[in-house]
């Protein structure tokens, strides 16, 4: 084995691991290993990748790298391994100046299988031209075999970025970084600008790989209960002296941006999703310090919390209550993902030429903060939030180990100390001392903002025709290319399309890839243990979990909904809980109190179908805090639930407008989810309720606040108040999750809370199912489509068949048809046993009618039994990996509590998992035949101009 030199070893008792930092001397690359008792093993290899333009070369390379390698000569090893392993996470990330390839699994055999595939992919990829065309960009005729049809650009990344750059948040971010970093790679769009992607060549892509995907430019990160030396030997054997060390002086690094002499003014157009979003937006952004310096990083986080944590924070208060705009911007606060730290503040809903007013408002605010400083209460609250953030094992979509590893990445990327970025106790202690020193925080305000010339003032200008202009420009380019093509060139293009389609349709030799068998999968899984806390005839539920010193709490109440007006009122009320005042506190005081004792109090709603098929629902408030604040936070949660004040019409209007803007900006990123919910809502009662709560139909509830029509607002608030007055009739439930048991004194205090111990949920609103095909316009450059059918609920004996069918359709049919051939960024099938719906969807899709036809064809394909036992095994592995995927300790407890409350006991879930493992081919064919024989609903959100119809 090559020489791995141990550079450093640090015990991190706060987060429960020992960090080891190794140097592989042969290549001068580092291995960061976080040793702990976690069964979820995580690996990540990261390369510095520094693009010179916005062709998306790093992004397209990330995709193409995973399309076959020297050892694994199959077209799509990445997606194949998703279903041949028990991975709890597999992905690849392209950032502004790095590319990473992470995975996680709880199976050690699986870990080394995936390690083999990943290392072969990044170091020895095939990078074939057909894969470049499929994943990046290509020219094709709209009708592949007819050169008389329109010429089109296709490609997975091309369509992904058309969708991405339709989103105002992404457009704003690119505008800010372009102007903040005129000399650095950050000025480019590493994902790719659609108009520039088509300039990328296959040869340039291969050269980019050769330059950056080298062991000397790599850092390896690992986490879990696995020996570092075992991993190091595997990496050594894989590399096998096939590379020569590149001296550090020859490697490329991102340098510091030169200081500005004066702030920069900039203007950029953006694409509003709808006419309601046509207001201007104004921003100011500063570069502060460097992300790999733990002291600068913590200082910046503390200042960001002090300024923006809640409505009582001085800068956030100004952004909410000024007379220039209607709400704080969606992009707000500290960004620490690059070498330079960036702080952003902004407002939405302004008028033209408001930038100077906004700049003066911000300058005045910082001058006042420097003069007055922060109160002791504000400082303690911000430090408390830092402490909570440090301790929390969050329930992110990323594995916890990967979250920790990514937090250390700046130290490795910029040749600093990665271990210092995770072991922050010493730096945090020093920051706490400094924060209370006179003038310290005011000096940071001056240094970061007042005296800092490294600032961009950006005006975002709405243009409802921006998408059409881009499409017209692209059409002119394509028509020009076509008019200059010879007959032979057109024929070659037709033949190239046929060749690519034949390649996509060819059956790969999957057996070259490693895989698990069912006997590698545990027969059963473990669940968190629960117990009831005896109080006074009411028993809160308690889970003792390793929460790293935090306590999590949830208080919930049964819902009674008898009309669509009730659903709309619930949506509004949920957005207001904790954000408006209570009977005894105005909203500023309430926000301040919440921040002092907790990590925030958040409202959510959950609906489910019980065993009898009836829809039930609950509203919940949840929080996290240090154990000493258990009683105080619980009392505050019940105060909010029972005594919220709904009289401050101005505040409510501000909050609802903020919610609307956030909702609008989520549409492009989550268009497939809106389409699935919309399609299911046409024929399924539970989905109908959910769609009116959080789908596009919910926009109607925002209408009075967007138009600011006083009479409409008054009328709606009257309905909300009426609904709220009946809310407390529902039964209360309470949950605690902690590694600290509640003391007898705390239980005594909780006894004094006014609980409602009786009641039941009843969602009885009228619903008339229908099956329709609906197309709705959406101002983006791509489409989102979904189809939905009735299916059995969780408790039905045949339910496991549909779970496997959905996985089979996604992996074996829709991935090929919708993504590879159709060019969509994503597509698949999803069975929801909790609502009783079976859905198919596409994401950032250039097509829509053809995609719906593919959805229909998938069921015919499955009903004919056009799959083998190996396909079934892969589908089972894919499903079981989702079921077995661990969450955070608190997340596991929340999930168990919710399912138990829905009569899905641990025993029933264990049996359900067992039944999934026993599904046969005949079962799958039977399920497909039943679905195929049904009517379905379909919804497409499309950029095409079509006759439209409302969803409901």
Mark where each language-model region is.
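Hydrophobic, small-residue-rich alpha-helical packing segments that form membrane-like cores
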Residues: 154, 160, 171, 175-177, ...
């Amino acid at each position: 084995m090559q020489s791995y030199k141990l550079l450093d070893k640090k015990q991190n008792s706060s987060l429960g691991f020992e960090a080891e930092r190794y140097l592989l001397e042969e290549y001068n690359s580092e291995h960061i290993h976080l040793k702990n008792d976690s069964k979820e093993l995580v690996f990540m290899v990261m390369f510095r990748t520094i693009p010179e333009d916005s062709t998306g070369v790093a992004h397209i390379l990330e995709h193409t790298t995973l399309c076959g390698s020297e050892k694994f000569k199959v077209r799509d090893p990445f997606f194949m391994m998703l279903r041949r392993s028990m991975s709890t996470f597999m992905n690849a990330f392209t950032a502004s100046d790095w590319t990473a390839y992470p995975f996680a699994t709880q199976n050690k055999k699986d870990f080394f299988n995936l390690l083999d595939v990943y290392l072969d992919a990044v170091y020895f990829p095939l990078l074939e031209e057909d894969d470049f065309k499929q994943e990046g960009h290509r020219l094709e005729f709209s009708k592949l075999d007819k050169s008389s049809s329109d010429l089109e650009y296709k490609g997975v990344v091309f369509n992904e970025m058309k969708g991405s750059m339709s989103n105002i948040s992404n457009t704003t971010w690119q505008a800010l970084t372009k102007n903040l970093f005129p000399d650095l790679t950050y000025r480019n769009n590493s994902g790719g600008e659609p108009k520039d992607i088509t300039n990328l060549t296959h040869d340039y892509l291969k050269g980019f790989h050769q330059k950056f995907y080298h062991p000397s430019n790599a850092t390896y990160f690992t986490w879990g209960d696995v020996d570092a030396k075992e991993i190091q030997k595997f990496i050594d054997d894989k590399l096998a002296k096939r590379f020569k060390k590149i001296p550090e002086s020859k490697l490329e690094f991102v340098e510091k941006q030169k200081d500005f002499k004066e702030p920069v003014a900039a203007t950029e157009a953006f694409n509003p999703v709808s006419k309601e979003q046509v207001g201007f937006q104004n921003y100011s952004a500063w570069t502060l310090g460097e992300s790999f310096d733990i002291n600068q990083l913590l200082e910046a986080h503390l200042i960001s919390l002090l300024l923006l944590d809640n409505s009582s924070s001085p800068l956030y208060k100004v952004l909410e209550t000024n007379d220039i705009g209607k709400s704080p911007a969606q992009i707000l606060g500290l960004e620490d993902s690059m070498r330079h730290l960036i702080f952003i503040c902004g407002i939405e809903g302004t008028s033209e030429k408001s930038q100077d007013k906004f700049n003066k408002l911000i300058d005045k605010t910082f001058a006042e903060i420097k003069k007055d400083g922060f109160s002791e209460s504000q400082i303690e609250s911000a430090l408390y939030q830092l402490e909570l953030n440090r301790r929390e094992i969050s329930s992110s979509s990323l594995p916890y180990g990967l979250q920790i590893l990514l937090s250390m990445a700046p130290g490795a990327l910029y040749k600093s100390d990665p271990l210092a970025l995770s072991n922050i106790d010493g730096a945090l202690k020093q920051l706490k001392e400094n924060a209370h020193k006179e003038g310290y925080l005011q000096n940071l305000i001056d240094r970061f903002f007042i005296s800092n010339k490294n600032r961009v003032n950006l005006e975002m200008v709405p243009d409802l025709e921006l998408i059409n202009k881009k499409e017209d420009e692209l059409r002119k380019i394509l028509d020009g290319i076509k008019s200059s093509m010879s007959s032979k060139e057109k024929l070659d293009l037709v033949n190239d399309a046929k060749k690519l389609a034949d390649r996509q349709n060819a059956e790969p030799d999957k057996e070259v890839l490693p895989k698990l068998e069912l006997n590698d999968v545990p027969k059963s899984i473990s669940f968190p243990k629960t117990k009831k806390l005896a109080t006074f005839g009411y028993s809160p539920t308690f889970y003792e979990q390793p929460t790293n010193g935090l306590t999590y709490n949830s208080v919930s109440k049964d819902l009674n909904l008898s009309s669509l007006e009730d659903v709309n009122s619930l949506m509004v009320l949920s957005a207001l809980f904790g954000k408006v005042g209570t009977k005894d506190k105005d909203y500023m005081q309430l926000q301040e109190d919440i921040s002092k004792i907790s990590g925030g109090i958040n409202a959510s709603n959950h609906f489910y179908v019980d065993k009898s098929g009836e829809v039930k629902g609950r509203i919940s408030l949840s929080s996290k805090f240090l154990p000493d604040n258990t009683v105080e936070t619980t009392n505050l949660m019940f105060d909010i639930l029972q005594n919220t004040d709904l009289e401050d019409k101005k505040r409510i209007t501000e909050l609802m407008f903020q919610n609307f803007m956030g909702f609008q900006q989520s549409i492009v990123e989550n268009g497939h989810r809106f389409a699935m919910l919309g399609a299911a809502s046409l024929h399924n009662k539970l989905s109908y309720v959910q769609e009116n709560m959080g789908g596009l139909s919910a926009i109607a509830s925002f209408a009075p606040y967007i138009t600011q029509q006083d009479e409409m607002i008054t009328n709606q608030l009257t309905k909300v108040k009426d609904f709220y007055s009946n809310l407390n009739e529902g039964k209360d439930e309470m949950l605690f999750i902690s590694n600290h048991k509640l003391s007898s004194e705390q239980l005594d205090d909780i006894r004094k809370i006014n609980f409602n111990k009786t009641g039941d949920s009843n969602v009885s609103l009228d619903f008339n199912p229908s099956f329709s095909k609906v197309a709705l316009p959406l101002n983006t450059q791509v489409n989102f489509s979904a189809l939905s059918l009735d299916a059995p609920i969780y408790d039905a004996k045949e339910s496991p068949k549909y779970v496997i069918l959905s996985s089979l359709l996604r992996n074996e049919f829709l991935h090929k048809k919708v993504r590879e051939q159709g060019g969509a960024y994503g597509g698949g099938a999803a069975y929801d046993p909790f609502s009783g719906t079976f859905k198919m969807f596409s994401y950032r899709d250039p097509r829509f009618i053809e995609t719906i036809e593919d959805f229909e064809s998938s069921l015919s394909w499955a009903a004919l039994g056009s799959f083998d036992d190996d396909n079934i095994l892969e589908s089972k592995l894919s499903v079981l990996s989702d079921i077995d995927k661990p969450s955070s300790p608190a997340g596991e407890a929340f999930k168990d509590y919710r399912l138990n409350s829905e009569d899905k006991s641990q025993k029933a879930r264990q049996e359900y998992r067992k039944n999934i493992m026993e599904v046969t081919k005949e079962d799958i064919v039977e399920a497909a035949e039943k679905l195929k024989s049904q009517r379905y609903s379909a919804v497409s959100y499309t950029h095409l101009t079509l006759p439209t119809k409302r969803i409901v």
